[in-house]
Swiss-Prot record:
PROSITE patterns: RIBOSOMAL_S2_1, RIBOSOMAL_S2_2. It comes from the Bacteria. Gene3D superfamilies: Glucose-6-phosphate isomerase like protein, domain 1 (3.40.50.10490), Helix hairpin bin (1.10.287.610). The gene is rpsB. Pfam families: Ribosomal_S2. Keywords: Ribonucleoprotein, Ribosomal protein. Residues 241-267 have a biased composition (Acidic residues). Residues 223-240 have a biased composition (Basic and acidic residues). The keyword Ribonucleoprotein applies. The keyword Ribonucleoprotein applies. This is Small ribosomal subunit protein uS2. Belongs to the universal ribosomal protein uS2 family. One of its GO terms (biological process) is translation. GO terms for molecular function: structural constituent of ribosome.
Length: 267
């Protein structure tokens, strides 16, 4: 779980310049220093821990959380920590309709799979050099934009976003579909579009890494709880089945041995 020391070391408290802010963020601002807003880390840590528990519980229920962050500072962290918790991600360009027109996106993912199959089964070798080159170029483009969501068979249950201002289209699509949005809120953000906000710096690399790492750890913790519950359910089910079988056996014995008597103790 994140600590105040973690937040300070990663610069989570540094907001934007005072001229670049959203007045709705006033309640999360501690003060101003040298023209920069300072975020109230007491509120940050409270929201952080609350959101951590929300994400952990969602993962324990088997829900899918989509990681989104396409700006330069966020791309590597989004990919790294989404993969660590085996969640889908978008870390390059957000294609309009990725959520609201997901059926079309799935068709594009299918095209990627077909091209890969052509490479595997030798179909690509039967094409002209130009045709093969065009397909490889298309494959590279599809991998770049859709590689992180290629295994996402259905719409996600939640969306974790780095920089909800830059990713406003993704946030808008999630809002439209009623998907909860999780996001760090810098001082230029609109808190009204985020369901589970964490006030904090969404520009510094270390801060972004901390947010992504904590969400990834929350998901893995939730998955571990889910696996544990599943094992206990299986064990309990097996135990119940054995117990019922023993009861049936004893009942059969009783029904077939009407004259059964308990032997007297021998002296």
């Amino acid at each position: 779980m994140v600590t105040m020391r973690d937040l300070l070391e990663c610069g989570v408290h540094f907001g934007h310049q005072t001229r670049r802010w959203n007045p709705k963020m006033k309640k999360f601002i501690f003060g101003e220093r040298k023209g920069i807003y300072i975020i109230d880390l007491q509120k940050t840590i409270r929201y952080f821990r609350y959101t951590y528990n929300i994400v952990r519980d969602a993962a324990a229920e088997g829900k899918t959380i989509l990681f989104v962050g396409t700006k330069k500072q966020a791309g590597a962290a989004i990919k790294e920590f989404a993969e660590k918790c085996e969640m889908p991600y978008v870390n390059h360009r957000w294609l309009g309709g990725m959520l609201t027109n997901f059926d079309t996106i799935k068709q594009s993912i299918r095209k990627l799979e077909v091209i890969e199959q052509m490479e595997t089964d030798g179909s690509m070798d039967l094409l002209t050099k130009k045709e093969a080159g065009m397909l490889k170029s298309k494959k590279a483009k599809l991998e770049l934009y859709l590689g992180g969501i290629r295994n996402m068979k259905n719409l996600p249950d939640m969306v974790f976003v780095i920089d909800c201002v830059k990713e406003k289209i993704a946030v808008k699509e999630a809002n439209r579909l009623g998907m909860p949005v999780i996001a760090p809120l810098d001082t230029n953000c609109d808190p009204d579009v985020v369901d589970f906000p964490i006030p904090g710096n969404d520009d510094a690399i270390r801060s972004i890494q901390l947010f992504c790492q904590e969400m990834s750890e929350a998901i893995n913790e939730g998955k571990a709880l889910r696996d544990q519950d599943s094992e206990e359910e299986i064990q309990n089910k097996e135990q119940d089945e054995v117990s019922q079988e023993e009861k049936d056996d004893i009942l059969d014995e009783a029904m077939n041995e009407e004259d059964f008597e308990i032997p007297e103790d021998k002296e």
